[in-house]
């Protein structure tokens, strides 16, 4: 409770190599990953998107188009699917990845700094609220229900068939 005259010396030492490894995104292996042709969906999030020509276009046995038309339409389907997909990913992939990153960062921040502290606070306060609610129920609602029950228990009905 007295006046403190001591000085507090605090030093923070940080290794530059350890700091750079853990705080930044490592882009060193991205070019190798893109060139290696590795599996870009290792958890099979989009395994249901196996869309081929036969999944979309099918001719029954009784009605077949000319073979050249079938071959050309199959080739046109595959080429257009490939070109349009490449064009759309070129146009939309980076903005959508940025938007998804911002969304997930926002949701993570809200979950960590707002939702979980609120839930923990509610769980901390809940036993007190439960005790108060039980007291109110025992003091007000239970006697009221008991007296209403006693009043209606003395009522008797007799039905006669005339």
UniProtKB/Swiss-Prot annotation:
Keywords, sorted A to Z: Cell membrane, Cytoplasm, Golgi apparatus, Membrane, Nucleus, Phosphoprotein
Family listed: Belongs to the caveolin family.
Domain of life: Eukaryota
A GO biological process held by the record: caveola assembly
Function: May act as a scaffolding protein within caveolar membranes. Interacts directly with G-protein alpha subunits and can functionally regulate their activity. Acts as an accessory protein in conjunction with CAV1 in targeting to lipid rafts and driving caveolae formation. The Ser-36 phosphorylated form has a role in modulating mitosis in endothelial cells. Positive regulator of cellular mitogenesis of the MAPK signaling pathway. Required for the insulin-stimulated nuclear translocation and activation of MAPK1 and STAT3, and the subsequent regulation of cell cycle progression.
Any GO MF annotation of the entry: D1 dopamine receptor binding
Protein's name in the database: Caveolin-2
């Amino acid at each position: 409770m007295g006046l403190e005259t001591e000085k507090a010396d605090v030093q923070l030492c940080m290794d530059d190599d350890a700091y750079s490894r853990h705080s930044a995104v490592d882009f060193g292996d991205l070019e190798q990953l893109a060139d290696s042709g590795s599996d870009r969906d290792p958890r099979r999030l989009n395994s249901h998107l196996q869309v081929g020509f036969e999944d979309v276009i099918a001719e029954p046995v009784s009605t077949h188009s000319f073979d050249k038309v079938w071959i050309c339409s199959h080739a046109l389907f595959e080429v257009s699917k490939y070109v349009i997909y490449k064009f759309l990913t070129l146009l939309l992939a980076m903005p959508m990845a940025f938007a998804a990153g911002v969304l997930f960062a926002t949701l993570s921040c809200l979950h960590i700094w707002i939702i979980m502290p609120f839930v923990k606070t509610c769980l901390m306060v809940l036993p007190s609220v439960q005790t108060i609610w039980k007291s109110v129920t025992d003091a007000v609602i239970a006697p009221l229900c008991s007296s209403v029950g006693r009043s209606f228990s003395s009522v008797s009905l007799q039905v006669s068939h005339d």
